[in-house]
Structures are given as C-alpha cells and as structure tokens.
Amino acid sequence: MLQATTTISNKLGLHARASAKLTKLAGGFPCEIWMTKGERRVNAKSIMGVMMLAAGIGSELTIDTEGDQAQEALDALLALIADKFGEGE
C-alpha cells in the first residue's frame, strides 16, 4: 500500500465540483483508493463518500492506494489537489 498526506488549498475546499473531478480521476484507475480525514475513511471513487469528508481549505487528507497503477493514481490525485482542482484559487 502506498500512502501520502496532503492539504486542501483551494478556496472552496472539496466541494461538489472538486469532488466530482477527484472521483472521476480516481475511477480511471484499477487500484483501490481510500481517503482519510480525521477518523473518517472513504472510498475515493465514491462522490458521496468524498463529499462526506467535508474537507475545507486547510484540511489535511491522507490518500492510500493499493493494487495495479497505485503509484500513478497517487501521483495523479496529489497533482489534482496541488493544482487546486483547476480552479486557480
């Protein structure tokens, strides 16, 4: 299993549009992808699960990937979050 911790830095946090981008990206990989915030762990391929994290700006998330293309998935998700989901703020 691969794991990385990142911080949500876009102004609106992990809102509906950002969650949709994240789950769409995650769904394109065959591996398992989990996200954790505090005590809550969710499947990153589930938009409802991701939105339930209620990750606002400054929230720290841990991403776990396991299986085929785990490294590629982790790198892609970290890049999306670092790019502020393409929102520029």
Q: Would you name each region that the model predicts?
A:
Residues 1-5, 60:
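Intrinsic-disorder/low-complexity, polar/charged segments enriched in Ser/Thr/Lys/Arg/Asp/Glu/Gln
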Residues 7-57:
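Compact, glycine-rich, soluble single-domain proteins
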